[in-house]
Amino acid sequence: MTSWIDSDAPVFFDTDCLGCFLWTSNLLVLRRLLDGRIRIPEEVVIEIMRRRPRSSRGYSVGMAQGDLRQFVSTGKAAVVCMELGSKQHDEFHRLVKGEFWGKRLGRGESAALAHARFAPGIAASNNRGDIVPYCRSYGLQWITTTRMMVDAVSSNRLAFEEARHMWERMVQEERRMPYPDFQSAWDSDARPEVETAATLDRPLNEE
């Protein structure tokens, strides 16, 4: 299977994964890695725009919302919507209602998965415990923030020092990162996280 970084497939972000780059003012790095492939479900945009404009750790919600508007309006990312009665729309509601394995998923996660399944494309989410069972069932590729950054450094598309500073910002902005710093993520990485149901045969371990 083609690695996510060499693929032409669109990448559908949930709110948390996009937030790792948005709240740290690193959307342009994301564009550098996925130029022309960034897809943001409408539900994710709504969740972000509904956040109250109060100051965070050095980066305000209002500034982030403005950055997202500009990112989309200048064509660096595409917002994707679901038509009423479409396969994506029906699948989205199935996931939100918990009709897949009895677990209700968030609207951003559900939208990213529904689009990734029927586009088709790649799901970008850090909530492995929520998305991996679904991706296993339908043979979907997925990536996390960790995987994107490690692979980007490995392929010389992102400098190690830049990745280290980005990770620090993510931790400062209270993103739920699986490692305390990028060096730990780099050292602990032993295999790709872009997997399919056909190749994944080990117990699920959340980051």
Language model region names:
Residues Y138-Q141, A159-F160:
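Short low-complexity, flexible loop/linker segments enriched in glycine and/or proline
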